[in-house]
UniProtKB/Swiss-Prot annotation:
Bilayer topology annotation: Multi-pass membrane protein
Gene3D superfamilies, sorted: MFS general substrate transporter like domains
Summary of the function given for this chain in its UniProt record: Sodium- and proton-independent thyroid hormones and aromatic acids transporter. Mediates both uptake and efflux of 3,5,3'-triiodothyronine (T3) and 3,5,3',5'-tetraiodothyronine (T4) with high affinity, suggesting a role in the homeostasis of thyroid hormone levels. Plays an important role in homeostasis of aromatic amino acids.
Organism of origin: Danio rerio
Record's protein name: Monocarboxylate transporter 10
GO CC annotation: basolateral plasma membrane; plasma membrane
Length: 505
């Protein structure tokens, strides 16, 4: 036992060479390769905040719970739609006070200039939508909505301190409107996380929130404007935006996000998440995205100028708030009815509901100058509100049908962004025609033409989608047939193989 020990002590001279071999062994260990694989899973858990079962599923396999916390989210989204579009739809009440506060009787373009305040506000809500869709995909519905409500609150507070139309363009027309845009769009996207089978009904209930506010806000604003004035009224409306901040905290996302295709260790999102070009590959979506803006050049004109038109025709004592209330009541009823009906209309055939709504809205806009009795205006507003609710409530369900749940955020965003141009331009043009012609008659006649044209364009969408599905079905059948032919042996070989043993026998 003592003899081998010196031999081991003498051999270290050749052994240093193998001792260097184990040193590189820790480098090929697969530990660093495992780290980037676990990071997307942690990000999914932090961003989605949902159960493990839903995290493991792809967005295509995800099934919404159809209720639960979704009912709370629905009520929060309803408040969002009400506070955002209720204030916008009631701008006709503030329009009269803006004319008296900032205008002059000697200004020939007074209505044209003042109408830009409301038009900028409504237009910017939709103009910012493509940017909002990117923020919604990157930051989530909750952060985007809460941040937008905070900006809207600041915009209304700042508007309560201005003393001329110039700053009002910025504070009310841009800052407040941008905040509303960031708060509004997530309220539509989050509904797809909780509902699928009842999505049409839920969208009808949510969008009915603007109808409830359109009914009540005109009376509330009239009382506030008479008692406390324009500036304190704007501060009261800022409280609505603060409540909207609290409502946005309920937007807990459930839809799992796909694993990022960016390089491991890179925190930059892929370009496809920032600008999703896949939605533009659908011809049906392209027709939809261009047909709806074409129909909306005259859509916002009655909401801005109808109150002034009533004062000019029926006198300042006319109960003009009743007209907005009629639009709001029937709009809410229409959203509930047509939202439920849309659940039973298969696929993209829901577009025909929008077509009918545009046709009726166009005809009713042309009927406004023909009403020389106040009761006739009430009937026109009732029908206009009913089909206005139809157009609004099925916008999100149609987007889900055309592009799928994973792409719906940017699909709605780009659509609303394209809607901003006609909704911004329409009311100032109507005000310009009034200042030049001395009457709103021509303005309302022209406002009814674009909805008729846009509705006719939308009729092509179901035909285009049906042709696409037939083509896809034919391609899949052809591919499966080729796969079966490649896997099965040729018929001649099988015949030869069966004949050979018979000849041997």
């Amino acid at each position: 036992m003592t003899e081998p020990e010196p031999t081991l002590e003498q051999e270290p001279t050749p052994e240093p060479e193998p001792t260097q071999e184990p040193t590189p062994e820790p480098t090929p260990e697969p530990e660093p390769t495992q780290e980037p694989e676990s990071e997307p899973e942690l990000e999914l858990k932090q961003e989605n905040g949902c159960t493990k079962a839903s995290e493991q599923k792809s967005p295509e396999e995800f099934e919404p719970p159809e209720g639960g916390w979704g009912w709370v989210v629905m009520l929060a989204s309803m408040w969002c739609n009400g506070s955002v579009f209720g204030i916008q739809n009631a701008f006709g009440i503030m329009f009269v006070y803006l004319l008296n506060e900032f205008g002059s009787e000697h200004d020939a373009d007074l209505r044209f200039k003042t109408a830009w305040v409301g038009s900028l506000s409504m237009g910017m809500i939709f103009f910012c939508s493509p940017i909002v869709s990117v923020f919604t995909d990157l930051l989530g519905c909750r952060i985007t909505a809460v941040g937008g409500a905070a900006v809207g609150c600041v915009g209304l507070l700042a508007s309560s301190f201005v003393t001329s139309l110039g700053p009002m363009y910025f504070t009310y027309g841009i800052v407040f409107a941008c905040g509303c845009s960031f708060a509004y769009q997530p309220s539509l996207v989050i509904l797809g996380h909780y509902f699928k089978r009842r999505l049409g009904l839920v969208n009808g209930i949510v969008t009915a929130g603007s109808s409830v506010f359109t009914i009540t806000l005109p009376y509330m604003l009239s009382g506030l404007l008479k008692s406390v004035g324009l500036y304190h009224t704007l501060r009261v409306l800022a409280i609505f935006m603060f409540i909207l901040m609290l409502a946005g905290l309920t937007y807990k996302p459930l839809l799992p996000k796909p694993v990022s295709s960016s390089k491991p260790g890179s925190r930059c999102p892929p370009l496809s998440r920032i600008f999703n070009v896949n939605i533009w590959k659908s011809l049906g979506y392209r027709i939809w995205a261009f047909g709806i803006p074409a129909a909306l050049y005259g859509y916002f004109v009655p909401y801005v100028h109808l109150m002034t038109h009533v004062e000019e025709r029926f006198g300042p004592e006319a109960n003009k708030e009743v007209l907005l209330a009629c639009i709001g009541i029937t709009s809410g009823v229409g959203r509930l009815i047509f939202g439920r009906v849309a659940d039973y209309v298969p696929g993209v055939n829901k577009v025909f509901l929008q077509v009918s709504s545009f046709m009726v809205i166009g005809v009713m806009s042309m009927m406004i100058p023909l009403c020389h009795v106040f009761g006739g205006l009430i009937a026109v507003c009732l029908l206009m509100g009913l089909f206005d609710g139809c157009f609004i409530c099925i916008m999100a369900p149609i987007a889900f049908e055309l592009v799928g749940s994973q792409n719906v955020s940017q699909a709605i965003g780009f659509l609303l962004g394209m809607m901003s141009i006609p909704m911004t331009v329409g009311p100032p043009i109507a005000g310009f025609l009034r200042d030049r012609l001395g009457s709103y008659d021509v303005a309302f006649y022209l406002a009814g033409i674009p909805p008729l044209i846009g509705g006719a364009v939308l009729c092509a969408i179901p035909w285009v989608e049906a042709r696409r599905k037939r083509r896809e079905a034919a391609n899949t059948a052809e591919n499966t047939e080729k796969m079966l032919e490649s896997r099965s042996p040729p018929l001649e070989d099988t015949v030869c193989r069966t004949e050979e043993p018979e000849s041997v026998i």
